[in-house]
């Protein structure tokens, strides 16, 4: 009887151990099994039909998407087929770049962007060449900067006041040559920089000569002091001894 009970308990223990092993293995397998990564791939919505973009937009040829017109010919491909960068930088028949084509044909200046866009200054007003701001013609050569590039004050010269009227004695500035005043501003700044550079060179030469003169004078004074210390004291001692030798004779003659 006892043996039968012992065998039953052993079977139950073995079955329980097997069940625990199965559960443990199942849990480990769940932890080790890689979780599939779900990736999301955006789907391109079908673009609008041809000719459906507003006049202020550009339509890509491949998918028909609408882009801002300023994105065209900006040296950055925005359409998948690159149609927004085609036929850019066209040239006029004489071979020079076309102005106002949004292409930077002058990397160091904004010459090809001058006078671009609508120039609708009313009569009696002038247009600043750099930013296109309209100013009254009476503000020209009034001693106050009204254009951001100082073009309204270039070529004015000195002014004299006679009978309440302001007169310019310099070169007259007209509407035709105001366009080129920004270039004169750059040239004047470069000339002023060269003048300042020349002045700095002159100041450096003067300072070097001054230092050299001071050093030479100090050397001469030092040499004279050494010579006096060695040779100038001997005559002084000789005079003292001669004075001592003459004093007894003087006293004897008096007696």
Swiss-Prot record:
User: InterPro entries in the record, alphabetically?
Assistant: LDL_receptor-like_sf, LDLR, LDLR_class-A_CS, LDrepeatLR_classA_rpt
SUPFAM superfamilies, sorted: LDL receptor-like module
Which residues are reported to be glycosylated?
177, 183
Q: What membrane topology was assigned to this protein in its record? A: Single-pass type I membrane protein
Record topological domains on the Cytoplasmic side: 225-255
Output the superkingdom of the source species.
Eukaryota
* Residue ranges that the UniProt entry lists as topological domain Extracellular: 30-203
- The LDL-receptor class A domain sits at 52-89, 120-157
Could you tell me what this protein does? Receptor for transcobalamin saturated with cobalamin (TCbl). Plays an important role in cobalamin uptake. Plasma membrane protein that is expressed on follicular dendritic cells (FDC) and mediates interaction with germinal center B cells. Functions as a costimulator to promote B cell responses to antigenic stimuli; promotes B cell differentiation and proliferation. Germinal center-B (GC-B) cells differentiate into memory B-cells and plasma cells (PC) through interaction with T-cells and follicular dendritic cells (FDC). CD320 augments the proliferation of PC precursors generated by IL-10.
Descriptive protein name: CD320 antigen
Chain's gene name: CD320
């Amino acid at each position: 009887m006892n043996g039968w009970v012992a065998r039953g308990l052993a079977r139950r223990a073995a079955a329980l151990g097997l069940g625990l092993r199965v559960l443990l293995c199942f849990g480990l397998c769940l932890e080790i099994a890689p979780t599939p990564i779900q990736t999301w791939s955006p789907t391109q919505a079908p673009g609008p039909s041809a000719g459906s973009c507003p006049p202020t937009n550009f339509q890509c040829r491949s998918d028909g998407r609408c882009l801002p017109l300023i994105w065209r010919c900006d040296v950055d491909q925005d359409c998948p087929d690159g149609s927004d960068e085609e036929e850019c930088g066209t040239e006029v028949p004489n071979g020079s770049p076309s102005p106002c084509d949004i292409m930077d044909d002058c990397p160091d200046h904004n010459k090809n962007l001058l006078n671009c866009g609508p120039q609708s200054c009313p009569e009696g007003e002038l247009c600043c060449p750099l930013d296109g701001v309209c100013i009254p013609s009476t503000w020209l050569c009034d001693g106050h900067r009204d254009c951001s590039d100082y073009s309204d004050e270039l070529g004015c010269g000195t002014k004299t006041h006679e009978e309440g009227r302001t007169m310019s004695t310099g070169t007259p500035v007209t509407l035709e040559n105001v366009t080129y005043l920004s270039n004169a501003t750059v040239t004047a700044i470069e000339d002023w920089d060269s003048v300042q550079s020349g002045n700095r060179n002159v100041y450096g030469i003067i300072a070097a000569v001054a230092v050299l003169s001071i050093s030479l004078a100090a050397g001469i004074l030092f040499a004279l002091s050494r010579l006096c210390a060695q040779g100038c004291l001997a005559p002084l001692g000789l005079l003292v001894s001669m004075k001592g030798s003459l004093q007894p004779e003087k006293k004897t003659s008096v007696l």
